[in-house]
Design a protein with these regions (language model features):
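Bacterial N-terminal signal peptides
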Residues: 6-16
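Histidine-rich, glycine-flanked metal-binding segment
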Residues: 32, 36-78
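Divalent-metal coordination cores built from histidine and acidic residues
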Residues: 72, 76-84, 94-209, 242-283
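Histidine/acidic-residue-rich catalytic or RNA/ligand-binding cores of hydrolases
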Residues: 92-94, 189, 219-226, 261-277, ...
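His/Asp/Glu-enriched, well-ordered alpha-helical/loop segment
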Residues: 204, 291-377
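Glycine-enriched alpha-helix->loop->beta-strand junction motifs that scaffold or abut catalytic
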Residues: 223-230, 249-254, 311, 338-339
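C-terminal cap of metal-dependent C-N hydrolases
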Residues: 347-349, 353, 368-405
């Protein structure tokens, strides 16, 4: 449904009261999209320091005496976005810039998949002011790909695959990334024997495995081998009944669709305040209709729609380093057939659960004070996620006063 009924009587409390102090702020009068499918009209959200203390309908939330009160009538609040497939910079200064840029566009956490190495994994432990949280697959695993990056482990046997997993595990990566793709016939791809060994070893080590893939037949083999997540949907053809049945038999399997560019010219005006004139001009130059891209998008859009109809667990990912990319991806997911409400759940609660971030993904008591203040309702039009009035990260306003690039 494009509009979810409001839960006017719902109140989510962390204890019976919140002590009043200068750090307590009550945001009042906005529509609150919880992130789990519920909506509260005319809500009150009380933030104490970096945490949400209360969230519920106006009149049902007890605002502590002395709390600062912010009138957000006419606005919509939604949780900050979780991007489960990025490729962030490998230099520390650039990585920190990437994480700040994501917060600017309303992203609270990003998973970088397999091209990072191990040198910057310490950044994951840092709560950087005004910056998204960092998650990483460290070094991914693939067959040798001469001419491409050497950041992943190159393996040619099951034993080498297991050894690569062991090294990832020793560095405590968040997930193991594998590539199963010939890159248009240029390379050999991981065989079922090798990726099966990788998945088995990872599971022994308490790690999950996410796969880059292209072909339907590889997707079937990966599901049978107990893969945990797909970093893309099937891209070579429409999925069939056998694949749908396999997916249904593995209800914990997670899909990050990473839809490609739709190949149609779009309005980029919303990006202008965040970019220098030079960077904006580069985007505009590339903003053209592309019939080939339209056909490629069509295959993946149909496959996403079919899996979504089965109740598949879907999260959001962008497969790149564009900090505004999640807003484009959400639009593409709706064009593919998901409702705005479904897309928001995928981009918030589902993403947080996939990355195992216990205090993110929904606007509920006890969660981190991470939310986007929007000028319009994204349940009516998903592109309204771009109409950002303010971003609050861990209870503090993110500086959006100047261009990022």
């Amino acid at each position: 449904m494009r509009r979810i009924a409001a839960f006017a009587a719902v109140v989510l409390l962390a204890g019976s009261a919140v002590p009043a102090s200068a750090k307590v702020v009550a945001y009042e009068g906005a529509r609150l999209i919880v992130g789990d499918g519920r909506v509260i009209e005319n809500a009150t959200l009380v933030v104490d320091g970096a945490k949400i203390a209360q969230a519920g309908a106006a009149g049902e939330v007890r605002v502590p005496a002395g709390a600062a009160r912010v009138n957000l009538s006419g606005k919509t609040l939604m949780p900050m976005i979780i991007d489960t497939h990025t490729h962030l910079s490998s230099k520390r200064e650039d990585l920190l810039r990437d994480l700040r840029a994501r917060a600017y566009f309303g992203v609270s956490a990003a998973l970088s998949l397999g091209l990072d190495g191990f040198a910057l994994l310490d950044v994951r432990k840092q709560a950087l002011p005004g910056a998204a949280r960092f998650f990483s697959a460290g070094r991914g695993i693939t067959m040798p790909e001469p001419g491409r990056t050497t950041a992943p482990f190159w393996v040619t046997s099951a034993a080498e695959g297991r050894k690569a997993v062991d090294e990832d595990a020793a560095h405590k990566v968040d997930i193991v990334k594998i590539w199963v793709d010939t890159r248009d016939g240029k390379y050999q791809k991981l065989s079922p024997e090798i990726y099966g060994a990788i998945i088995d070893e990872a599971h022994k080590r308490g790690l999950r495995v996410i796969a880059h893939l292209f072909d339907l037949e590889d997707a079937k083999g990966l599901v049978r081998a107990r893969i945990d997540a797909f970093a893309h949907g099937v891209r070579d053809k429409d999925i069939d009944d056998e694949f749908v049945a396999l997916w249904k038999a593995h209800p914990n399997l997670v899909l990050t669709p990473n839809l490609p560019d739709r190949g149609v010219k779009v309005d980029l005006g919303w990006l202008r305040p965040g970019l220098s004139p030079e960077e904006f001009a580069k985007l505009e130059k590339a903003n053209v209709d592309n019939p080939k891209a339209q056909a490629f998008y069509g295959i993946q859009a149909r496959n996403l729609a079919r899996l979504n109809a089965t109740g598949a667990r879907i999260v959001l990912g962008t497969d790149g380093n564009k900090p505004w990319g999640p807003h484009d991806e959400m639009q593409d997911m709706v064009v593919a057939g998901m409702t705005p409400a479904q897309v928001i759940v995928a981009a918030t609660r589902n993403g947080a659960e996939f990355l195992r971030i216990a205090d993110a993904g929904t606007l509920q008591a006890g969660k981190s004070g991470d939310f986007i203040v929007l000028d319009a309702n994204p349940l009516d039009d998903i592109s309204n996620t771009r109409r950002i009035s303010q971003v609050i990260l861990r209870g503090a306003s993110v500086d959006r006063s100047k261009p990022l690039f």
